[in-house]
């Protein structure tokens, strides 16, 4: 099983700390699916202010994590000359539900799957 570490992901995405949220990507099926891990730590940048007495990862950062995982999957599956000096954007989110809070000292597991593509839009 191929695993992309954070140092591999940095080569695929323009994001840097503290906004590089995904820690690794595995179960990679090029341009189709993968699993990403976000290690939510006590010292994560959002913990101090969201919310001081009951910290949770903001939903928008969970969605951002999905976008980063999808972008890394896409860049990993393409020939480098295809994506070099280009950005991959999340084009939409349908029916997002946050059923449980994501709290510090937990591992957020994201399963991503490409469900359709149209030209350069996935």
Q: How should these model regions be labeled?
A:
Residues 25, 57-82:
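Active-site helix/loop of acyl-thioester processing domains in fatty-acid/polyketide metabolism
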Residues 19-21, 108-109, 122:
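Hydrophobic core residues within well-ordered beta-strands of beta-rich domains
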Residues 10, 53, 98-100:
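Beta-strand-rich interaction surfaces with strong enrichment in secreted/lumenal proteins
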Residues 4-16, 83-84:
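Short aromatic-glycine motifs in intrinsically disordered, low-complexity regions
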Residues 3, 15, 37-39, 113:
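Small/polar/charged residue-enriched interaction surfaces, especially the RNA/DNA-contacting tracks
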Residues 29-32, 116-121:
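Short, conserved beta-turn/loop elements at beta-strand boundaries and strand-helix junctions
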Residues 17-57, 62:
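Catalytic strand-loop segment that frames the active site of acyl-thioester-processing enzymes
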């Amino acid at each position: 099983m191929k695993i992309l570490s954070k140092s591999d992901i940095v080569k695929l995405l323009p994001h840097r700390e503290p906004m590089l949220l995904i820690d690794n990507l595995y179960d990679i099926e090029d341009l189709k699916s993968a699993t990403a891990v976000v290690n939510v730590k006590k010292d994560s940048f959002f913990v101090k202010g969201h919310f001081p007495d009951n910290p949770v990862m903001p939903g928008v950062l969970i969605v951002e994590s999905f976008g980063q995982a999808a972008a890394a999957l896409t860049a990993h599956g393409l020939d480098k000359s295809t994506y070099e000096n280009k950005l991959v954007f999340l084009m939409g989110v349908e029916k997002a539900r946050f059923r449980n809070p994501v709290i510090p000292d937990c591992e957020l597991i994201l399963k991503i799957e490409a469900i359709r593509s149209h030209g350069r839009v996935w």
